[in-house]
């Protein structure tokens, strides 16, 4: 028992040291790191979506839900960069964190479903989904620290309920179709997150808006 408590204490101290170290890093550097991570997230989700697109049968495309049915669609977000540039830093951070948090459970469903997906690249897809989860967790931790530096408004998170399930389809076509749809929604949102963080990075570096 004492050994377990010692290990637990060491882990707690390690986490505290990591948080303290990150808290001492200038906000510009933290935004650079977050922007790099969000870029990786969007790039990986884009690659995954393309991999799946080649194997969705014609009937699958007719069955696929439209983007407005993504579970995050109720969140009011800028439609383009010009609109994003009109928002405050706190609003942009709040939107990015809300979108990222809304994907915690859906990414678990994607990971579980990837293990039984009938696809030539099933193993690769499964590994990449796990990478998405790791990058999302890492980015989320970073944004928690950043929002803490920016104040209460940046820490506000909008609730975006996800009503999915572990089983995203009864047969291979419906599973592949729903898997692709869910991943497409994530790709769309990862692009938004990446765009918001790039605007924040530009502002922190005092770069002209048109250069963002």
Curated annotation (Swiss-Prot):
Parts of the chain that traverse the membrane: none
Major localization class: secreted
GO cellular component: extracellular space
Keywords assigned: Disulfide bond, Hormone, Secreted, Signal
Keyword tRNA processing: no
Signal peptide positions on this chain: 1-24
Disulphide bridges, residue numbers: 70-185, 202-212
Source species: Sparus aurata
Family: Belongs to the somatotropin/prolactin family.
InterPro entries: 4_helix_cytokine-like_core (IPR009079), Somatotropin/Prolactin (IPR001400), Somatotropin_CS (IPR018116)
Subcellular location: Secreted
Molecular-function GO term, any one: hormone activity
The protein's name: Prolactin
GO biological process terms held by the UniProt record: positive regulation of cell population proliferation; positive regulation of receptor signaling pathway via JAK-STAT; response to nutrient levels
């Amino acid at each position: 028992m004492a050994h377990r408590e010692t290990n637990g204490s060491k882990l707690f101290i390690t986490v505290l040291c990591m948080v303290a170290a990150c808290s001492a890093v200038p906000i510009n550097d933290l935004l650079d790191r977050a922007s790099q991570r969000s870029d990786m997230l969007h790039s990986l989700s884009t690659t995954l979506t393309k991999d799946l697109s080649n194997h969705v049968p014609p009937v699958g495309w007719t069955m696929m839900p439209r983007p407005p049915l993504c579970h995050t669609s109720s969140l009011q977000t800028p439609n383009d960069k010009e609109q994003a540039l009109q928002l405050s830093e706190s609003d942009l951070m709040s939107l990015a964190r809300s979108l990222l948090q809304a994907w915690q459970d859906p990414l678990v469903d994607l990971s579980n479903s990837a293990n039984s997906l009938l696809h030539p690249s099933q193993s690769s897809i499964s590994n990449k989904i796990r990478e998405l989860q790791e990058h999302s967790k890492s980015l989320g931790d970073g944004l928690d620290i950043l929002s803490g530096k920016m104040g209460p408004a940046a820490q506000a998170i909008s609730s975006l309920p996800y009503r999915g399930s572990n089983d995203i389809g009864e047969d291979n076509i419906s599973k592949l179709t729903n898997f692709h749809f869910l991943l497409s929604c994530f790709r769309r949102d990862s692009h938004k997150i990446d765009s918001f963080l790039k605007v924040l990075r530009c502002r922190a570096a005092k770069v002209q808006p048109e250069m963002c």
